Amino acid sequence: MKIGITGAEGTIGSVLRKGLSNKYKISSFTLKNQDFESIQMDLSNNNEIQGKFEGLDALIHLAADPRPEASWESVKKNNIEATFNVYNEVKKAGVKKIIFASTNHTQHGDTLLTTPETLDLQKSKILSLENNTNPDSLYAVSKLFGEDLGKYFSEQYKIKFIGLRIGWIVKEDDPTVMCGTPSEDYLRSMYLSHRDCIQVFERALESSRNYLIAYAISNNSRKVFDLKETSRALNFNPEDNSENYFMNMK
């Protein structure tokens, strides 16, 4: 299978380029020149992406402004206009599947403490995919747009679509990097390890579902997302738990 990865220079992109390379032929798409082979283009510029996805079987769309505090101007350009351009080019190129990097922030609006990367433990509760969305930022709003646009392209153009509401993956692959900070509780809940990240994207690539929204977090003791439906739909069985890292600190 030939797959493309937009935003291949980011943390998740770097994990997937390495973790999926033994099984898939990967084309990397980046905004700027990198120290690895990639095709440079601005996804918000429709002219730059024309023809770039030809020959792909699936596209993993990671590229975005990932900051919860991102301005509307940036969100509109990098997360909304770019995502439409990507999906539209996927359609033109005959790509059969989109894996979209959505976010946990789509359901975090009433449980943040002070900022989108904090968690109010008094309001924390187990949420499922059946619960209403509650975006905590314009960034999260843009990801809901990506999910809904994916539904449109799935229904109207028969492109398979899986949106992964991703937790928090850190470059160090160790949630204790936030120990003692205001974001510690949030990361303990939302942690996604590198190997669990690779597994959930691989399961998404292998899935035959026409349209699916799923969670992408590790099996954390403090998780706030119910993984049962995701595990059933994708055969995703995360191996890691953020609490194990903190226990090893003692």
Predicted stretch roles:
Residues M178-C179, I213-N237:
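Conserved C-terminal active-site "lid" loop/helix of NAD(P)H-dependent oxidoreductases
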Residues L138-F145:
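Active-site helix of classical SDR
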Residues V141, I162-I166, G180-R203:
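Substrate-positioning beta->alpha
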Residues L31-N45:
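Rossmann-fold cofactor-recognition segment
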Residues M41-N78:
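NAD(P)H-binding glycine-rich loop region in Rossmannoid oxidoreductase-like domains
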